[in-house]
Amino acid sequence: MKNKEQDINHSRERYFRIIGLDLREMDGVVSKTLQTGWYPFGEYPKPENGYIKLSPLSRRVLRLYRIKTSLPNINVSCIVGKNGSGKSSLLDVMFRILNNLSYKLILEKDTPIKPELQYAYGVHADLYYESDGKLNVIVCDEERMSFYRELRKGVMKPIPISSGNFDEILSKFFYTIGVNYSVYAFNKYDYQSCSPNNFINGEWLDGIFHKNDGYLAPLTLVPYRENGSIDIRKENNLAQQRITALSILGMSKQKSFPAGYYPKVLSYKINLNYKTEKLERFIKSNSQYNAEMLKSVINKLELKWGKYVGDKLKELYNVNSDEYQIVLFYMAYKTLKICLTYNDYFEILDVNKLKIKFDEGADSFIEYQQKFLPGIAEKIIQKVLNSPNDHITLKIFQCLYFINKGDNQLKGEIKVNDFIKQYQPKTYNEEVKHLYPPFFETDIVFSRANRQKLHNIDSSWDEINNSQQFNLSKMSSGEKQMLYAMSYVLYHLKNLQSVNEDNYRVPYHHVNLVFDEAEL
Protein backbone atom coordinates (compact mmCIF):
# COMPACT_ATOMS: atom_id res chain seq x y z
CA MET A 1 0.00 0.00 0.00
CA LYS A 2 2.89 2.31 0.85
CA ASN A 3 4.53 1.71 -2.55
CA LYS A 4 1.27 2.57 -4.33
CA GLU A 5 0.98 5.79 -2.34
CA GLN A 6 4.58 6.67 -3.20
CA ASP A 7 3.86 6.02 -6.90
CA ILE A 8 0.85 8.36 -6.76
CA ASN A 9 2.87 11.13 -5.08
CA HIS A 10 5.70 10.65 -7.56
CA SER A 11 3.20 10.92 -10.43
CA ARG A 12 1.93 14.23 -9.06
CA GLU A 13 5.48 15.57 -9.01
CA ARG A 14 6.08 14.57 -12.64
CA TYR A 15 2.67 15.58 -13.94
CA PHE A 16 2.16 18.09 -16.72
CA ARG A 17 -1.10 19.74 -17.74
CA ILE A 18 -2.26 22.86 -19.56
CA ILE A 19 -4.46 24.77 -17.10
CA GLY A 20 -5.93 27.44 -19.36
CA LEU A 21 -5.69 30.78 -21.14
CA ASP A 22 -6.65 34.17 -19.72
CA LEU A 23 -7.49 36.52 -22.61
CA ARG A 24 -7.49 40.31 -22.64
CA GLU A 25 -8.62 42.69 -25.37
CA MET A 26 -6.90 41.85 -28.67
CA ASP A 27 -7.08 42.75 -32.35
CA GLY A 28 -9.99 40.97 -34.01
CA VAL A 29 -7.72 39.02 -36.36
CA VAL A 30 -6.16 37.37 -33.28
CA SER A 31 -9.18 36.93 -31.02
CA LYS A 32 -11.75 36.38 -33.81
CA THR A 33 -14.97 35.29 -32.02
CA LEU A 34 -13.28 34.83 -28.62
CA GLN A 35 -14.30 37.13 -25.78
CA THR A 36 -12.03 38.40 -23.04
CA GLY A 37 -11.87 36.23 -19.94
CA TRP A 38 -10.77 32.88 -18.56
CA TYR A 39 -10.74 29.75 -20.75
CA PRO A 40 -9.87 26.76 -18.54
CA PHE A 41 -8.80 23.43 -20.07
CA GLY A 42 -10.50 21.58 -17.24
CA GLU A 43 -12.33 22.31 -14.00
CA TYR A 44 -9.87 24.97 -12.88
CA PRO A 45 -10.72 28.20 -11.02
CA LYS A 46 -10.11 31.63 -12.47
CA PRO A 47 -6.67 33.18 -11.75
CA GLU A 48 -6.48 35.75 -8.98
CA ASN A 49 -3.51 38.13 -9.09
CA GLY A 50 -1.63 35.78 -11.42
CA TYR A 51 -2.12 32.70 -9.26
CA ILE A 52 -4.43 29.68 -9.33
CA LYS A 53 -4.96 27.51 -6.29
CA LEU A 54 -4.99 24.06 -7.85
CA SER A 55 -6.58 21.11 -6.11
CA PRO A 56 -4.35 18.03 -5.76
CA LEU A 57 -4.84 15.54 -8.56
CA SER A 58 -7.07 12.68 -7.50
CA ARG A 59 -6.03 9.05 -7.72
CA ARG A 60 -8.78 8.57 -10.30
CA VAL A 61 -7.23 11.14 -12.63
CA LEU A 62 -3.68 9.89 -12.10
CA ARG A 63 -4.64 6.28 -12.78
CA LEU A 64 -7.08 6.92 -15.62
CA TYR A 65 -4.59 6.51 -18.48
CA ARG A 66 -1.84 4.59 -16.69
CA ILE A 67 -1.61 0.93 -17.61
CA LYS A 68 1.87 0.59 -16.10
CA THR A 69 3.72 2.77 -13.60
CA SER A 70 6.73 2.79 -15.93
CA LEU A 71 4.71 4.50 -18.68
CA PRO A 72 4.39 8.29 -18.98
CA ASN A 73 1.66 10.20 -17.18
CA ILE A 74 -1.10 11.25 -19.56
CA ASN A 75 -3.63 14.04 -19.22
CA VAL A 76 -6.36 14.57 -21.83
CA SER A 77 -8.34 17.78 -22.39
CA CYS A 78 -10.98 18.43 -25.05
CA ILE A 79 -12.21 21.72 -26.48
CA VAL A 80 -15.83 21.34 -27.54
CA GLY A 81 -17.98 23.91 -29.32
CA LYS A 82 -20.00 24.76 -32.39
CA ASN A 83 -18.42 25.74 -35.68
CA GLY A 84 -17.17 29.30 -35.40
CA SER A 85 -17.15 29.33 -31.59
CA GLY A 86 -13.37 29.88 -31.43
CA LYS A 87 -11.88 26.43 -30.75
CA SER A 88 -9.03 26.78 -33.25
CA SER A 89 -8.65 30.48 -32.41
CA LEU A 90 -7.97 29.56 -28.78
CA LEU A 91 -5.27 27.13 -29.88
CA ASP A 92 -3.83 29.81 -32.16
CA VAL A 93 -3.41 32.10 -29.15
CA MET A 94 -1.55 29.33 -27.33
CA PHE A 95 0.68 28.70 -30.36
CA ARG A 96 1.44 32.43 -30.64
CA ILE A 97 2.46 32.61 -26.97
CA LEU A 98 4.70 29.53 -27.28
CA ASN A 99 6.23 30.93 -30.47
CA ASN A 100 6.93 34.28 -28.80
CA LEU A 101 8.51 32.66 -25.75
CA SER A 102 10.77 30.66 -28.08
CA TYR A 103 11.66 33.81 -30.00
CA LYS A 104 12.59 35.74 -26.85
CA LEU A 105 14.65 32.89 -25.38
CA ILE A 106 16.52 31.94 -28.54
CA LEU A 107 17.00 35.32 -30.26
CA GLU A 108 19.86 36.39 -28.00
CA LYS A 109 21.23 32.90 -27.36
CA ASP A 110 24.74 32.47 -28.72
CA THR A 111 24.08 29.83 -31.38
CA PRO A 112 25.81 29.53 -34.76
CA ILE A 113 22.45 28.82 -36.44
CA LYS A 114 19.48 31.02 -35.65
CA PRO A 115 16.07 29.37 -36.08
CA GLU A 116 13.91 31.31 -38.52
CA LEU A 117 11.48 32.40 -35.82
CA GLN A 118 9.40 35.56 -36.13
CA TYR A 119 7.42 37.28 -33.41
CA ALA A 120 3.62 36.94 -33.43
CA TYR A 121 2.26 40.39 -32.63
CA GLY A 122 -1.15 41.28 -31.26
CA VAL A 123 -1.31 38.86 -28.31
CA HIS A 124 -2.61 39.99 -24.93
CA ALA A 125 -3.08 36.78 -22.98
CA ASP A 126 -1.60 34.54 -20.28
CA LEU A 127 -0.95 30.81 -20.56
CA TYR A 128 -1.15 28.80 -17.31
CA TYR A 129 0.28 25.30 -17.02
CA GLU A 130 1.47 22.92 -14.33
CA SER A 131 4.81 21.14 -14.64
CA ASP A 132 6.49 18.89 -12.08
CA GLY A 133 4.00 19.93 -9.42
CA LYS A 134 4.57 23.67 -9.93
CA LEU A 135 2.28 26.28 -11.48
CA ASN A 136 3.83 28.29 -14.33
CA VAL A 137 2.53 31.36 -16.15
CA ILE A 138 3.60 32.95 -19.45
CA VAL A 139 2.34 36.53 -19.70
CA CYS A 140 2.25 38.07 -23.18
CA ASP A 141 1.31 41.71 -23.77
CA GLU A 142 2.36 42.56 -27.31
CA GLU A 143 6.19 42.69 -27.17
CA ARG A 144 6.32 42.55 -23.36
CA MET A 145 6.59 39.04 -21.99
CA SER A 146 7.02 37.68 -18.47
CA PHE A 147 7.48 34.21 -17.04
CA TYR A 148 6.55 33.09 -13.51
CA ARG A 149 7.11 29.80 -11.70
CA GLU A 150 5.54 28.80 -8.40
CA LEU A 151 8.07 29.10 -5.58
CA ARG A 152 5.69 27.89 -2.90
CA LYS A 153 1.94 27.90 -2.43
CA GLY A 154 0.61 31.34 -3.29
CA VAL A 155 4.03 32.77 -4.24
CA MET A 156 5.14 33.11 -7.88
CA LYS A 157 8.78 33.77 -8.73
CA PRO A 158 9.50 35.91 -11.83
CA ILE A 159 12.16 34.49 -14.15
CA PRO A 160 13.40 36.95 -16.79
CA ILE A 161 12.89 35.67 -20.34
CA SER A 162 16.41 35.87 -21.71
CA SER A 163 19.06 33.62 -23.18
CA GLY A 164 20.69 33.51 -19.74
CA ASN A 165 17.64 31.68 -18.39
CA PHE A 166 17.25 29.41 -21.42
CA ASP A 167 18.05 26.21 -19.51
CA GLU A 168 16.16 27.17 -16.36
CA ILE A 169 12.91 27.78 -18.24
CA LEU A 170 13.06 25.08 -20.91
CA SER A 171 14.44 22.25 -18.76
CA LYS A 172 11.02 22.08 -17.07
CA PHE A 173 9.07 23.16 -20.13
CA PHE A 174 7.09 21.09 -22.63
CA TYR A 175 7.40 20.39 -26.33
CA THR A 176 4.25 21.06 -28.36
CA ILE A 177 3.32 19.19 -31.53
CA GLY A 178 0.26 20.70 -33.22
CA VAL A 179 -1.50 18.58 -35.85
CA ASN A 180 -4.11 20.00 -38.21
CA TYR A 181 -4.82 18.51 -41.64
CA SER A 182 -7.60 20.93 -42.56
CA VAL A 183 -6.85 22.41 -45.97
CA TYR A 184 -7.96 25.83 -44.66
CA ALA A 185 -5.82 25.85 -41.49
CA PHE A 186 -2.63 27.84 -40.89
CA ASN A 187 -2.80 29.90 -44.07
CA LYS A 188 -0.55 32.80 -43.10
CA TYR A 189 -2.43 35.18 -45.39
CA ASP A 190 -5.53 34.74 -43.21
CA TYR A 191 -3.61 36.15 -40.23
CA GLN A 192 -3.07 39.62 -41.69
CA SER A 193 -4.73 42.39 -39.68
CA CYS A 194 -7.25 44.61 -41.46
CA SER A 195 -6.26 47.55 -39.25
CA PRO A 196 -3.37 49.91 -40.01
CA ASN A 197 -1.22 47.82 -37.66
CA ASN A 198 0.71 45.85 -40.23
CA PHE A 199 2.78 44.07 -37.61
CA ILE A 200 -0.01 41.55 -37.03
CA ASN A 201 0.37 38.88 -39.70
CA GLY A 202 1.01 35.18 -40.19
CA GLU A 203 4.72 35.31 -41.00
CA TRP A 204 5.48 33.69 -37.63
CA LEU A 205 3.94 30.44 -38.87
CA ASP A 206 6.81 29.85 -41.32
CA GLY A 207 9.31 29.43 -38.50
CA ILE A 208 7.48 26.64 -36.68
CA PHE A 209 6.24 24.41 -39.49
CA HIS A 210 9.23 22.19 -40.00
CA LYS A 211 11.79 21.11 -37.46
CA ASN A 212 15.08 22.23 -38.95
CA ASP A 213 16.48 23.55 -35.67
CA GLY A 214 17.34 20.27 -33.96
CA TYR A 215 14.35 20.61 -31.60
CA LEU A 216 15.73 23.81 -30.12
CA ALA A 217 12.44 25.75 -30.12
CA PRO A 218 9.72 23.85 -28.20
CA LEU A 219 7.02 23.99 -30.88
CA THR A 220 6.24 22.52 -34.28
CA LEU A 221 3.14 22.41 -36.45
CA VAL A 222 2.41 19.58 -38.89
CA PRO A 223 1.97 18.92 -41.72
CA TYR A 224 4.45 21.29 -43.30
CA ARG A 225 2.90 24.06 -45.38
CA GLU A 226 4.46 26.52 -47.77
CA ASN A 227 2.43 29.70 -48.19
CA GLY A 228 -0.53 27.91 -46.66
CA SER A 229 -0.39 24.89 -48.99
CA ILE A 230 0.46 21.26 -48.25
CA ASP A 231 2.64 19.49 -50.83
CA ILE A 232 0.57 16.30 -51.04
CA ARG A 233 3.15 14.35 -53.05
CA LYS A 234 5.89 15.14 -50.55
CA GLU A 235 3.59 14.34 -47.61
CA ASN A 236 2.69 11.00 -49.18
CA ASN A 237 6.36 10.08 -49.64
CA LEU A 238 7.34 11.02 -46.09
CA ALA A 239 4.30 9.31 -44.60
CA GLN A 240 5.05 6.19 -46.65
CA GLN A 241 8.49 5.94 -45.05
CA ARG A 242 7.22 6.48 -41.50
CA ILE A 243 4.22 4.15 -41.79
CA THR A 244 6.32 1.43 -43.42
CA ALA A 245 8.74 1.51 -40.50
CA LEU A 246 6.02 1.68 -37.84
CA SER A 247 3.92 -1.11 -39.35
CA ILE A 248 6.86 -3.50 -39.64
CA LEU A 249 8.01 -2.66 -36.11
CA GLY A 250 4.48 -3.28 -34.85
CA MET A 251 4.41 -6.64 -36.61
CA SER A 252 7.72 -7.62 -35.00
CA LYS A 253 6.19 -6.88 -31.59
CA GLN A 254 3.02 -8.88 -32.37
CA LYS A 255 0.96 -5.71 -32.70
CA SER A 256 -0.61 -3.95 -35.64
CA PHE A 257 -0.11 -0.43 -36.94
CA PRO A 258 -2.58 0.66 -38.08
CA ALA A 259 -4.96 -1.45 -36.03
CA GLY A 260 -6.32 -4.36 -38.04
CA TYR A 261 -3.78 -4.04 -40.87
CA TYR A 262 -0.58 -5.99 -41.23
CA PRO A 263 2.31 -5.40 -43.66
CA LYS A 264 2.85 -8.28 -46.07
CA VAL A 265 5.28 -7.34 -48.84
CA LEU A 266 7.79 -4.49 -49.17
CA SER A 267 8.69 -3.53 -52.73
CA TYR A 268 11.59 -1.28 -53.74
CA LYS A 269 13.01 0.37 -56.85
CA ILE A 270 15.95 2.75 -57.17
CA ASN A 271 15.15 6.27 -58.37
CA LEU A 272 17.79 7.11 -60.97
CA ASN A 273 16.65 10.74 -61.00
CA TYR A 274 17.21 11.11 -57.25
CA LYS A 275 20.46 13.08 -57.41
CA THR A 276 19.16 15.65 -59.91
CA GLU A 277 15.84 16.13 -58.12
CA LYS A 278 17.26 16.27 -54.59
CA LEU A 279 20.12 18.64 -55.46
CA GLU A 280 17.69 21.06 -57.10
CA ARG A 281 15.36 21.06 -54.06
CA PHE A 282 18.28 21.30 -51.62
CA ILE A 283 19.73 24.37 -53.32
CA LYS A 284 16.30 26.00 -53.52
CA SER A 285 15.59 25.43 -49.81
CA ASN A 286 19.02 26.85 -48.85
CA SER A 287 18.91 29.94 -51.03
CA GLN A 288 20.81 31.94 -48.39
CA TYR A 289 23.94 30.08 -49.55
CA ASN A 290 25.50 30.26 -52.99
CA ALA A 291 24.61 27.20 -55.09
CA GLU A 292 28.18 26.70 -56.34
CA MET A 293 29.49 26.79 -52.78
CA LEU A 294 27.04 24.06 -51.73
CA LYS A 295 27.95 21.92 -54.74
CA SER A 296 31.66 22.29 -53.94
CA VAL A 297 31.20 21.15 -50.35
CA ILE A 298 29.08 18.19 -51.47
CA ASN A 299 31.83 17.24 -53.91
CA LYS A 300 34.48 17.29 -51.16
CA LEU A 301 32.26 15.22 -48.87
CA GLU A 302 31.67 12.72 -51.70
CA LEU A 303 35.43 12.27 -52.07
CA LYS A 304 35.87 11.80 -48.33
CA TRP A 305 32.97 9.33 -47.99
CA GLY A 306 34.42 7.48 -51.01
CA LYS A 307 37.51 6.67 -48.96
CA TYR A 308 35.31 5.11 -46.27
CA VAL A 309 32.83 3.17 -48.40
CA GLY A 310 34.32 3.18 -51.91
CA ASP A 311 35.72 -0.37 -51.85
CA LYS A 312 32.45 -1.88 -50.63
CA LEU A 313 30.43 0.27 -53.02
CA LYS A 314 32.53 -0.91 -55.99
CA GLU A 315 31.40 -4.45 -55.21
CA LEU A 316 27.80 -3.30 -55.76
CA TYR A 317 28.03 -0.91 -58.70
CA ASN A 318 30.43 0.23 -61.39
CA VAL A 319 32.29 3.39 -60.34
CA ASN A 320 30.97 5.28 -63.36
CA SER A 321 27.39 4.11 -62.94
CA ASP A 322 24.49 6.34 -61.90
CA GLU A 323 23.83 4.04 -58.95
CA TYR A 324 27.35 4.48 -57.55
CA GLN A 325 27.15 8.25 -57.91
CA ILE A 326 23.70 8.42 -56.29
CA VAL A 327 24.83 6.57 -53.16
CA LEU A 328 27.89 8.79 -52.65
CA PHE A 329 25.87 11.92 -53.41
CA TYR A 330 23.23 10.94 -50.85
CA MET A 331 25.79 10.46 -48.07
CA ALA A 332 27.48 13.78 -48.89
CA TYR A 333 24.22 15.70 -49.29
CA LYS A 334 22.83 14.31 -46.04
CA THR A 335 26.06 15.18 -44.22
CA LEU A 336 25.96 18.77 -45.48
CA LYS A 337 22.28 19.06 -44.60
CA ILE A 338 23.14 18.02 -41.03
CA CYS A 339 25.90 20.65 -40.94
CA LEU A 340 23.48 23.39 -42.01
CA THR A 341 20.87 22.30 -39.45
CA TYR A 342 22.64 21.41 -36.20
CA ASN A 343 24.82 23.88 -34.33
CA ASP A 344 27.65 21.54 -33.34
CA TYR A 345 28.13 20.33 -36.93
CA PHE A 346 27.70 23.88 -38.23
CA GLU A 347 30.65 24.94 -36.07
CA ILE A 348 32.90 22.14 -37.32
CA LEU A 349 32.22 23.02 -40.96
CA ASP A 350 32.59 26.70 -40.00
CA VAL A 351 29.94 27.71 -42.51
CA ASN A 352 30.37 31.42 -41.86
CA LYS A 353 34.07 31.27 -42.77
CA LEU A 354 33.18 29.18 -45.80
CA LYS A 355 30.86 31.97 -46.97
CA ILE A 356 33.54 34.60 -46.39
CA LYS A 357 36.10 32.68 -48.44
CA PHE A 358 33.61 32.13 -51.25
CA ASP A 359 32.74 35.83 -51.32
CA GLU A 360 36.44 36.74 -51.51
CA GLY A 361 36.64 35.15 -54.95
CA ALA A 362 37.45 31.93 -56.76
CA ASP A 363 41.17 31.84 -55.92
CA SER A 364 40.60 32.32 -52.19
CA PHE A 365 37.84 29.71 -52.08
CA ILE A 366 39.81 27.12 -54.09
CA GLU A 367 42.83 27.58 -51.83
CA TYR A 368 40.63 27.19 -48.73
CA GLN A 369 39.01 24.08 -50.17
CA GLN A 370 42.31 22.42 -50.93
CA LYS A 371 43.97 23.32 -47.62
CA PHE A 372 41.21 22.94 -45.06
CA LEU A 373 38.06 21.23 -46.37
CA PRO A 374 39.49 17.67 -46.49
CA GLY A 375 40.46 17.87 -42.81
CA ILE A 376 37.14 19.45 -41.86
CA ALA A 377 35.24 16.78 -43.81
CA GLU A 378 37.18 14.11 -41.93
CA LYS A 379 36.19 15.60 -38.56
CA ILE A 380 32.54 15.79 -39.57
CA ILE A 381 32.42 12.20 -40.80
CA GLN A 382 34.15 10.98 -37.64
CA LYS A 383 31.54 12.76 -35.54
CA VAL A 384 28.78 11.15 -37.60
CA LEU A 385 30.30 7.68 -37.24
CA ASN A 386 30.62 8.16 -33.48
CA SER A 387 26.88 8.89 -33.18
CA PRO A 388 25.16 5.67 -34.34
CA ASN A 389 22.12 6.02 -32.06
CA ASP A 390 21.26 9.64 -32.82
CA HIS A 391 18.19 10.53 -34.90
CA ILE A 392 20.38 13.11 -36.64
CA THR A 393 22.61 10.48 -38.25
CA LEU A 394 19.99 7.73 -38.68
CA LYS A 395 19.62 8.03 -42.46
CA ILE A 396 23.39 7.98 -42.99
CA PHE A 397 23.66 4.77 -41.00
CA GLN A 398 20.76 3.39 -43.02
CA CYS A 399 22.87 4.00 -46.13
CA LEU A 400 25.94 2.40 -44.52
CA TYR A 401 23.90 -0.68 -43.60
CA PHE A 402 22.64 -0.85 -47.19
CA ILE A 403 26.20 -0.77 -48.56
CA ASN A 404 27.41 -3.41 -46.11
CA LYS A 405 24.51 -5.75 -46.96
CA GLY A 406 25.90 -6.05 -50.48
CA ASP A 407 22.47 -5.99 -52.12
CA ASN A 408 22.90 -4.66 -55.66
CA GLN A 409 19.34 -5.33 -56.81
CA LEU A 410 17.84 -2.20 -58.33
CA LYS A 411 14.31 -3.37 -57.67
CA GLY A 412 12.55 -6.25 -56.02
CA GLU A 413 10.30 -7.42 -53.21
CA ILE A 414 10.81 -8.83 -49.74
CA LYS A 415 8.23 -10.49 -47.54
CA VAL A 416 7.82 -8.57 -44.31
CA ASN A 417 7.79 -11.83 -42.35
CA ASP A 418 11.21 -12.70 -43.80
CA PHE A 419 12.49 -9.18 -43.08
CA ILE A 420 11.47 -9.46 -39.42
CA LYS A 421 12.99 -12.93 -39.01
CA GLN A 422 16.23 -11.81 -40.66
CA TYR A 423 16.81 -8.55 -38.76
CA GLN A 424 14.65 -8.95 -35.62
CA PRO A 425 14.34 -5.18 -35.02
CA LYS A 426 13.69 -4.15 -31.42
CA THR A 427 13.40 -0.38 -31.93
CA TYR A 428 12.31 2.08 -34.61
CA ASN A 429 15.90 3.12 -35.32
CA GLU A 430 17.10 -0.48 -35.58
CA GLU A 431 14.45 -1.22 -38.14
CA VAL A 432 14.97 1.94 -40.20
CA LYS A 433 18.66 1.10 -40.55
CA HIS A 434 17.71 -2.11 -42.37
CA LEU A 435 15.15 -0.52 -44.70
CA TYR A 436 16.08 0.83 -48.12
CA PRO A 437 17.56 4.37 -48.20
CA PRO A 438 15.51 7.32 -49.55
CA PHE A 439 17.01 7.06 -53.06
CA PHE A 440 14.82 3.97 -53.41
CA GLU A 441 11.10 4.29 -54.02
CA THR A 442 9.33 1.87 -51.72
CA ASP A 443 5.80 0.64 -51.33
CA ILE A 444 4.20 -1.74 -48.90
CA VAL A 445 1.29 -4.12 -49.33
CA PHE A 446 -1.04 -4.47 -46.35
CA SER A 447 -3.48 -7.20 -45.45
CA ARG A 448 -6.65 -6.71 -43.49
CA ALA A 449 -6.92 -9.40 -40.84
CA ASN A 450 -9.01 -10.52 -37.90
CA ARG A 451 -7.20 -8.95 -34.94
CA GLN A 452 -8.55 -11.50 -32.49
CA LYS A 453 -6.68 -14.26 -34.31
CA LEU A 454 -3.38 -12.41 -34.56
CA HIS A 455 -1.38 -13.35 -31.49
CA ASN A 456 2.07 -13.84 -32.99
CA ILE A 457 3.82 -13.67 -36.33
CA ASP A 458 3.90 -17.39 -37.10
CA SER A 459 0.32 -18.19 -36.18
CA SER A 460 -1.05 -15.15 -37.97
CA TRP A 461 0.76 -15.36 -41.28
CA ASP A 462 -1.61 -17.84 -42.93
CA GLU A 463 -4.50 -15.64 -41.83
CA ILE A 464 -2.80 -12.63 -43.38
CA ASN A 465 -2.00 -14.42 -46.63
CA ASN A 466 -5.68 -15.20 -47.09
CA SER A 467 -6.86 -11.67 -46.32
CA GLN A 468 -7.60 -8.78 -48.64
CA GLN A 469 -4.38 -7.11 -49.81
CA PHE A 470 -3.83 -3.52 -50.88
CA ASN A 471 -1.27 -0.71 -50.91
CA LEU A 472 -1.24 2.19 -48.47
CA SER A 473 -2.45 4.46 -51.26
CA LYS A 474 -5.64 2.39 -51.53
CA MET A 475 -6.72 3.04 -47.94
CA SER A 476 -9.57 5.46 -47.38
CA SER A 477 -8.79 9.16 -47.05
CA GLY A 478 -9.91 9.09 -43.41
CA GLU A 479 -7.65 6.15 -42.59
CA LYS A 480 -4.70 7.79 -44.32
CA GLN A 481 -5.21 11.07 -42.48
CA MET A 482 -5.28 9.30 -39.11
CA LEU A 483 -2.18 7.31 -40.07
CA TYR A 484 -0.31 10.36 -41.32
CA ALA A 485 -1.09 12.31 -38.14
CA MET A 486 -0.11 9.49 -35.78
CA SER A 487 3.04 8.67 -37.75
CA TYR A 488 4.08 12.33 -37.52
CA VAL A 489 3.57 12.35 -33.76
CA LEU A 490 5.42 9.06 -33.22
CA TYR A 491 8.25 10.24 -35.46
CA HIS A 492 8.75 13.46 -33.47
CA LEU A 493 8.42 11.66 -30.12
CA LYS A 494 11.07 9.19 -31.20
CA ASN A 495 13.39 12.04 -32.21
CA LEU A 496 12.75 13.95 -28.97
CA GLN A 497 13.85 10.88 -27.02
CA SER A 498 17.29 11.05 -28.61
CA VAL A 499 17.88 14.76 -27.96
CA ASN A 500 20.68 15.10 -25.42
CA GLU A 501 21.61 18.18 -23.46
CA ASP A 502 24.44 20.13 -25.07
CA ASN A 503 25.60 23.72 -25.40
CA TYR A 504 22.52 24.62 -27.43
CA ARG A 505 19.64 22.28 -26.62
CA VAL A 506 17.82 20.88 -23.62
CA PRO A 507 15.92 17.57 -23.60
CA TYR A 508 12.17 17.96 -23.09
CA HIS A 509 10.52 15.69 -20.51
CA HIS A 510 6.94 16.82 -21.16
CA VAL A 511 5.05 16.77 -24.46
CA ASN A 512 1.88 18.64 -25.42
CA LEU A 513 0.06 16.95 -28.33
CA VAL A 514 -2.63 19.08 -29.99
CA PHE A 515 -5.01 17.47 -32.48
CA ASP A 516 -7.04 20.27 -34.03
CA GLU A 517 -9.94 19.49 -36.38
CA ALA A 518 -9.64 15.93 -35.06
CA GLU A 519 -13.03 14.99 -36.50
CA LEU A 520 -11.52 15.23 -39.98
Model-derived regions, located:
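Conserved small-residue
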Residues: V29-P40, P45-T69, N75, V80, ...
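Short, flexible coil/linker segments at or flanking structured domains
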Residues: N9, V29, I67, P115, ...
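Generic detector of bulky aromatic hydrophobic side chains
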Residues: L101, L105, Q118-Y129, L135-V137, ...
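Generic alpha-helix signal with a bias toward terminal, lower-confidence helices
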Residues: Y51-K53, I106, F186, D231-E235, ...
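Switch/communication elements of ASCE P-loop NTPase nucleotide-binding domains
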Residues: R14, I18-N100, N456-L520
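Generic alpha-helical propensity signal that fires on short helical segments
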Residues: I97, E108-K109, Q192, N237-A245, ...
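Coupling/switch/interface segments within P-loop NTPase motor domains and analogous charged loops
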Residues: M1-G20, Q118-Y121, D126-G133, V137-S467
